[in-house]
UniProtKB/Swiss-Prot annotation:
Assembly with partners or alone: Lactose synthase (LS) is a heterodimer of a catalytic component, beta1,4-galactosyltransferase (beta4Gal-T1) and a regulatory component, alpha-lactalbumin (LA).
Pfam families per record: Lys
Protein name, per record: Alpha-lactalbumin
Stretches assigned to the C-type lysozyme domain: 20-142
Signal peptide bounds: 1-19
Amino acid sequence: MMSFVSLLLVGILFHATQAEQLTKCEVFQELKDLKDYGGVSLPEWVCTAFHTSGYDTQAIVQNNDSTEYGLFQINNKIWCKDDQNPHSRNICNISCDKFLDDDLTDDIMCVKKILDKVGINYWLAHKALCSEKLDQWLCEKL
């Protein structure tokens, strides 16, 4: 019985630390701290996150000379540091792998720095796909 409880506990803790693909309503709830920050509405953020990563907190995109991480696809040349790019400017002062978990606190802090420095156009999906007709990005459950 004790080994079953231990195994169950390990399974629960393992699951709790894993990154995940979030739902629209989970993203909507998690991003409340970004509401209207930099003049960007919450539905705009939900749309941008969807078109940037598909709500996947583990999303990694390798480019020719850089890599983008997490829900917001934060780049390792400027915003975070990893082994691939040890000379990053690391403006957010964080390891890129911190953007690959389901705790979005550090992601949101870095997103605010990106907004302050370069604005919402850092995310190409925003202008093309998320600047109008935003009703579909609301969460009806809340």
